Amino acid sequence: MRSCVCYTLLLFIFFIWLRVATCSSFTDMESLLKLKDSMKGDKAKDDALHDWKFFPSLSAHCFFSGVKCDRELRVVAINVSFVPLFGHLPPEIGQLDKLENLTVSQNNLTGVLPKELAALTSLKHLNISHNVFSGHFPGQIILPMTKLEVLDVYDNNFTGPLPVELVKLEKLKYLKLDGNYFSGSIPESYSEFKSLEFLSLSTNSLSGKIPKSLSKLKTLRYLKLGYNNAYEGGIPPEFGSMKSLRYLDLSSCNLSGEIPPSLANLTNLDTLFLQINNLTGTIPSELSAMVSLMSLDLSINDLTGEIPMSFSQLRNLTLMNFFQNNLRGSVPSFVGELPNLETLQLWDNNFSFVLPPNLGQNGKLKFFDVIKNHFTGLIPRDLCKSGRLQTIMITDNFFRGPIPNEIGNCKSLTKIRASNNYLNGVVPSGIFKLPSVTIIELANNRFNGELPPEISGESLGILTLSNNLFSGKIPPALKNLRALQTLSLDANEFVGEIPGEVFDLPMLTVVNISGNNLTGPIPTTLTRCVSLTAVDLSRNMLEGKIPKGIKNLTDLSIFNVSINQISGPVPEEIRFMLSLTTLDLSNNNFIGKVPTGGQFAVFSEKSFAGNPNLCTSHSCPNSSLYPDDALKKRRGPWSLKSTRVIVIVIALGTAALLVAVTVYMMRRRKMNLAKTWKLTAFQRLNFKAEDVVECLKEENIIGKGGAGIVYRGSMPNGTDVAIKRLVGAGSGRNDYGFKAEIETLGKIRHRNIMRLLGYVSNKETNLLLYEYMPNGSLGEWLHGAKGGHLKWEMRYKIAVEAAKGLCYLHHDCSPLIIHRDVKSNNILLDGDLEAHVADFGLAKFLYDPGASQSMSSIAGSYGYIAPEYAYTLKVDEKSDVYSFGVVLLELIIGRKPVGEFGDGVDIVGWVNKTRLELAQPSDAALVLAVVDPRLSGYPLTSVIYMFNIAMMCVKEMGPARPTMREVVHMLSEPPHSATHTHNLINL
């Protein structure tokens, strides 16, 4: 009887448990489905979390992608990173009270964190990084999560002070709060974490002193506090007691003072990053006690003295970065003996004497950069002994002798920069065949001999051999350099004709072959090289005429053929070259009259001086200088009249024939139009493909540029659209992902992004359809007749709006989108003068996609290109930031980025030069010296504030520039003084 009762009791308990488990299981499924609906948002793809569907099964939800359950079918883990999702976290997340791991990283989730998160008391791992969560971080919500070990909120939009409640989480080991907008100082209480091993607070807006009490974190192994924080004072010497530290990063955070010798006690440290600060004094020799050290970066400070000899004990060192300091003396011989050294960067110091001849003999050297020092002697022969060396950077020194032959056999090399030395001899021919080299710069040396007839560097983007003693003919084999963008052969002794093959290179942008002994005509292939932005063929003995079709070079900014023997009339078509800002045809044999109108209004008479038979509108006599006029006089009046009659008859007949053919072709075109063109819409459009194509007429053209020709199209329903006909981007079988990428761009929706409505395509052409912007581009307003009407308040507003558009591309798109061609002409204004960023993501499609599948090397427009592009041939978000900084300078100064400051000087260089010329330099004095004279009644503090942001954006080093998110934050929240109008300037 007793056993029967026990059995019944157990059965009853089992059914109770089963009912509870069933209810909990179905509750979890219901919560997951609500979670899906909220997290997807309106922009997510239809297949996002597609398998999260209701199914009448207790365990169905446990098979959802990214979901893990325990034995009781309760959800214990969710990982939905990289979906992407565009919604928010709903309150229902709190119902999943058995969750131990919640990972929603790499999405576009927005809003504030729901207070219901506090119910997740079992949570051990919370990762919400790489989203757009905002507001103050709710530390009180996290406080009940007493089991939490990992908290990662990197790259969001959290503001306010750092959450102090987190110190009560006794099991917390990993805390990553970087990449937000936290402000204020680091709380002293952060020294009270019990178990913390990883702490990263970098890339915020923190200030104050770094608390020395952080040294009490005895379990800490990783500490990162730098990057765009701005602390007061220096490195706390107490940090030397943190014996468990393996990684210490205090870079780019305004630290001053000397490096504490007490850091030598960190014997377990393998990484020490102190770069981009204001540290002074010498490098402490005591740091040699850090025998575990592998990476040491002290670059971009004000350190003095020599490299300590005691550093010979750092046998594990792989990276030694000391560049941009004031270090002096010689490089000790032990540096060449460090067995693991891979990176040695000492550039921009005061080092001197001969480099250790044993450099590279360790067999691991990859990156070697000693640019801008005072080194003498020979280039070490064994730099590439390992076959791993990627960069040789020795520009601006006093090296002599030849380049070692071993360098010509170093197939791992990607960059050779050896300009401005005293090197001589014949350059090893193997250098011009290295498969991976992207840059060869040998300018301003004493090299001689001929270039090898065989050249085949398939990756070479920059070839600079200027100001040497090279002789012989320019080899046609240059045509093999399909990635070449810059070719500088000026100031040598080359002879013969310019090989036409040079201008068949699909990516060529800059050509300088001036100052040689070249003869013959300018190759006609020049007019096909539509990527060109600068051409200098001056100081040669070229003859013939400027080739017809020069107007095809729509991106050309500089064209110099002065001091040659070129003849014929000045081409009329130059008037249509709107990008051309510098033209020099002086000292040639041009004849006739200089055309007027169009772009000719930009050029002065100096551009045409030294041509005896050429006159301008001010210097021409009444009689024409054209030879045809003299011929007409010799024919007499009767002959001239007869000729005119014949010409008129022929013209009328030809016109009638053309009209008939045109009518026939138009009818035929309309019949076939719908069959040859296809419209792909990204939203509801009330027009057809043939309506778009009908607008491709000369009279509808509203712009031409590197991205193609832009037409204004009026659709039958009354809608106006902008139609961009892309250059060199076909849509046939070999479109190299064009359709996929354009469709991705078509899904982008932001108030300050020019909306892509759809595209029309056939086998040869792609037409992109955008919303029409009636007020044109910012460039037109700044540099055209309208500039005087663009008041300061409007300029500032446009800057904020454009920054928000770029910020969206960089931080809110997944994957992020690099614009690649930020400029004032790509910031368009709608009817309310609201800014819209245009042409984003198009730069990679501007060249023939069949020529190369490597499109990432297209950098942007002349004057906007970041300086590091010359070294890397790559662009990233910080390249866009630099270009945006140039746009900010345009808004302040009102001048184009190039062409108005003298040869070789752009707007950034001019501003820096102006600063140096001021008797009493200050921000106010500099702004008053450069500000647009058309501005009046502007608040000086506001202009200074935006000017300082612009100068942050155009810093020479990419890592030192702010992100676009930081730019938006700064522009949107100026200090109180910058918004006041008490300091108005009237000019």
Curated annotation (Swiss-Prot):
Organism: Glycine max
Similarity-based family: Belongs to the protein kinase superfamily. Ser/Thr protein kinase family.
Recorded superkingdom: Eukaryota
Inactivation phenotype: Dramatic increase in root nodule number when inoculated with symbiotic rhizobia.
Record gene name: CLV1B
Protein's recorded name: Leucine-rich repeat receptor-like kinase protein CLV1B
Catalytic activities: L-seryl-[protein] + ATP = O-phospho-L-seryl-[protein] + ADP + H(+); L-threonyl-[protein] + ATP = O-phospho-L-threonyl-[protein] + ADP + H(+)
Binding-site residues for ATP, renumbered to this chain: 702-710, 724
Any one GO MF annotation of this record: protein serine/threonine kinase activity
All copies of domain Protein kinase, residue ranges: 696-985
Keywords from the UniProt entry: ATP-binding, Cell membrane, Differentiation, Glycoprotein, Growth regulation, Kinase, Leucine-rich repeat, Membrane, Nucleotide-binding, Receptor, Repeat, Serine/threonine-protein kinase, Signal, Transferase, Transmembrane, Transmembrane helix
Enzyme active site: 821 (proton acceptor)
Residues of this chain annotated as glycosylated in UniProt: 79, 101, 108, 127, 157, 254, 265, 278, 316, 350, 512, 517, 552, 560, 622
